[in-house]
From Swiss-Prot:
Gene3D superfamilies: RnfH-like (3.10.20.280). This is UPF0125 protein bbp_234. HAMAP family: UPF0125_RnfH (MF_00460). Pfam families: Ub-RnfH.
Amino acid sequence: MITITIVYFTNKIQHVKKIKLNIGTPVHEALKILQINIKKNNKIGIYGELVSLNHILNNKDRLEIYRPLKINPRELRKQKINRKLK
């Protein structure tokens, strides 16, 4: 058995869950077990590195589900600069 941590957000709430899985469990199985439905535009990572849904999880992995950005960081900087100039 392996133990992993899954981190994801719903609205403005961060969820952190630890679960035990069988050795050789892929990401998509872990999500199915936790009944987490991800959208097509969500990315999945382990410790900040993107992985596929078929990636095999290892003991003590931190599985992260990333939300899509609401605004491009470059556009956000432009908006902040424009506000300061006014």
